[in-house]
From Swiss-Prot:
Residues 45-58, 134-283 are extracellular. GO terms for biological process: intercellular transport; medium-term memory; monoatomic ion transmembrane transport; phototransduction. Residues 1-23, 80-112, 305-438 are cytoplasmic. This is Innexin inx7. One of its GO terms (molecular function) is gap junction channel activity. GO terms for cellular component: cytoplasm; gap junction; membrane; nucleus; plasma membrane. It comes from Drosophila melanogaster. Its main location: membrane. It is a multi-pass membrane protein. InterPro entries: Innexin. It is found in: Cell membrane; Cell junction, Gap junction. Residues 381-402, 415-438 are annotated as: Disordered. Keywords: Cell junction, Cell membrane, Gap junction, Ion channel, Ion transport, Membrane, Transmembrane, Transmembrane helix, Transport. The keyword Transport applies.
Length: 438
């Protein structure tokens, strides 16, 4: 059994170094649904649990021959014999009985040949939006935050880093350098990040479209019975009526086998086939019905949440609670307001995922420095010109956080001493500005 599911083990392992670039709704699509469909494919193709997929009984025909013939040639049931009485031991199975080919209508069942292929293809379809988003995202978040998931312990390490297995906890000096990298990247990519948020929203909408397509396709694949499969299965569970599962996934079917007799005439053999494969099929599709229903509700709620972020991302209260939901922690409201006032939606989403990957200790440092250095995308059309301009003197609404270590000390030193003095000094001199790192 463990060997059967070894191929999906890599999608279930817990990794502390994994970088978050999407939300839980996205993960339900490309991780959980992908794994569920992959496991279903393995179950269908494995004979360890259900034995032979089909076993047919007929006098005068070798079993392996007729089994193979009836598996690749659709079996059928007689519609007239699919009555509304539940099957009981000793009674005739639904759809089985004598029939006249010229008068009676039959229902052919050929889908079971394609079930593993369809399930595997659907698993790939649920992974495609994630693959597209991962390509569009380009590893930007990972490049900035990789190795910083446990940086809350950095304050105790000072100048020495700590490695625990594959997990590396950086020293204080390394963390400070990473803060400077994040700050510079946010400023440098103000314009380049314009499409970042649009691609994320498109990928989330693509998840919903793909889910609706898979539900529609599955319904057609099962002859239009999938949409109502869940409610009908629950209803028939406690009634004497014929279960819809016995109609969609018949356990016993008929098969006609033709062969040449000794004299050359064609002989027809009426075979009764036990469909062990359908016992597994009905369980899989019942689970998929309830999972798809749950996933559809969650996906719609996720898109409603995305609409709220589009409408209220510049509201400081909404942002504070959103960041707290991403990862608990307290942030300075004045500094946060200063940053989001200068953010478009893409930059806001970039900050949101930074918060999802950074500790409170490090994210406070990032917000503190962005508060006074972030250009305004609505007014600062040339980011390069902004970077070449003299730094703006620090304002009182951006108070210095006493609990944070100094980052980029030459720049902050000039900021703190650059306010007008009693002697009429007007900020840093030209010689001081020349000392700033380029």
């Amino acid at each position: 059994m463990l060997n059967t599911f070894s191929s999906v083990r890599q999608y279930l392992k817990f990794d502390l170094t994994r970088v978050v670039i999407d939300n839980i709704v996205f993960k339900l699509h490309y991780r959980w649904t992908f794994v569920i469909l992959l496991v279903a494919t393995l179950l269908i193709t494995s004979r360890q649990y259900i034995g032979e997929h089909i076993q047919c009984l007929s006098d005068g025909v070798v079993s392996p021959v007729i089994n193979t013939f009836c598996f690749f040639t659709p079996t059928f049931t007689v519609v007239r014999d699919q009555n509304q009485t539940a099957y009981r031991p000793g009674s005739e199975p639904p759809g089985i009985g004598a029939f006249d080919p010229e008068k009676d209508t039959i229902k052919r069942h050929a889908y079971y040949q394609w079930v593993p292929f369809v399930l595997f293809f659907q698993a790939l379809c649920f992974y495609i939006p994630h693959a597209l988003w991962k390509s569009w995202e380009g590893g930007r978040i990972k490049a900035l935050v990789f190795g910083l998931r446990m940086v809350g312990l950095t304050r105790y390490l000072k100048n020495d880093s700590l490695r625990i297995g594959k997990l590396n906890i950086p020293s204080m000096a390394e963390a400070e350098e990473r803060v400077k990298d994040i700050r510079r990247t946010m400023i440098d990519r103000m314009r380049l990040n314009q499409s970042w948020g649009a691609h994320l929203v498109f990928a989330e909408v693509l998840n919903l479209i793909n889910l609706l397509l898979q539900i529609t396709w599955t319904n057609r694949f099962l002859g239009g019975q999938f949409l109502t499969l869940g409610p009908h299965a629950l209803k028939n569970r406690w009634s004497d009526e014929l279960s819809v599962l016995d109609l969609v996934f018949p356990k016993i079917t008929k098969c006609k086998f033709h062969k040449f007799g000794d004299s050359g005439s064609i002989q027809m053999h009426d075979a009764l086939c036990v469909m062990a494969l359908n016992i597994m099929n009905e369980k899989i599709y019942i689970i998929l019905w309830f999972w798809y229903a749950f996933l559809l509700i969650v996906t719609v709620l996720g898109l409603l949440w995305r609409i709220l972020t589009l409408c209220f991302y510049r509201n400081v209260t909404f942002t504070r609670w959103s960041l707290y939901w991403a990862k608990p922690g307290q942030l300075d409201e004045n500094e946060l307001l200063a940053v989001i006032d200068k953010c478009n939606f893409s930059n806001w989403m970039f900050l949101f995922f930074l918060r999802s990957n950074l500790s409170e200790f490090l994210f406070k440092k990032v917000i503190y420095h962005l508060a006074s250095e972030f250009p305004n995308p609505d007014h600062d059309n040339d980011v390069n010109a902004y970077r070449e301009a003299p730094p703006t003197p620090a304002k009182n609404r951006y108070p210095e956080l006493s609990g944070l270590d100094t980052i980029d000390s030459p720049l902050l030193h000039l900021r703190r001493n650059g306010s007008p003095s009693a002697g009429g000094a007007q900020g840093p001199s030209t010689s001081d500005m020349a000392k700033l790192p380029v």
